[in-house]
A protein has these predicted regions:
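Surface-exposed amphipathic alpha-helical segments
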Residues: 14, 113-136
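N-terminal "mature-domain start" segment
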Residues: 1-19
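Short, structurally constrained coil/turn elements
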Residues: 10, 62-66, 129
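Conserved polar/disulfide-associated segments of primarily extracytoplasmic proteins
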Residues: 19-112, 116-124
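Generic hydrophobic secondary-structure signal
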Residues: 6-8, 78, 113, 129-130
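Short non-domain terminal segments
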Residues: 4-6, 88, 101, 131
């Protein structure tokens, strides 16, 4: 799948939607998506510590909006980029879900890679999203 400035792979049988700066693929309650945001100032590796602090706050706010909690946070590699990843646990329509959000910062772009799946279930689409994501 291709979006404005990125590409990624998702299971072929999933339904694809495109809205504004987001490309998403979904099947049942599972979703993977990539959304882009323009940063006001270019990101540089020297800003990593400050970026982590800010992203930690963003993740906590997103979890609160979902009436959930941040259950994990970690630094990961996405391609050659260092990225920050969060697992948010919440309940929707009586179903326990996990939303894994990975923030990739490159120059003036922020890429938000999202994967939502049922808690306790396998999440191969999340791994596929991270392994296949390529900024343009």
């Amino acid at each position: 799948m291709h979006g404005d400035g990125f590409s990624f792979a998702a299971p072929g049988s999933w339904t694809v939607t495109r809205t504004g700066t987001t490309v998403a693929a979904s099947h049942g309650g599972d979703t993977v998506s990539v959304t882009t945001f323009r940063l006001t100032k270019p990101y540089r590796a020297q800003l990593w510590k400050q970026a982590v602090t800010e992203l930690d706050q963003v993740a906590a706010k997103l979890a609160a909006e979902l009436k959930g909690t941040v259950v994990a946070s970690r630094t990961v590699k996405v391609g050659s980029s260092t990225a920050r990843q969060y697992d948010l646990a919440f309940t929707k329509d009586g179903e326990q879900l996990v939303e894994r959000i990975t923030f990739v910062l490159l120059g003036r772009r922020e890429y938000e890679l999202l994967c939502r799946y049922e808690a306790g279930k396998d999440e191969p689409a999340c791994s596929q999203l991270l392994a296949s994501f390529r900024p343009a």
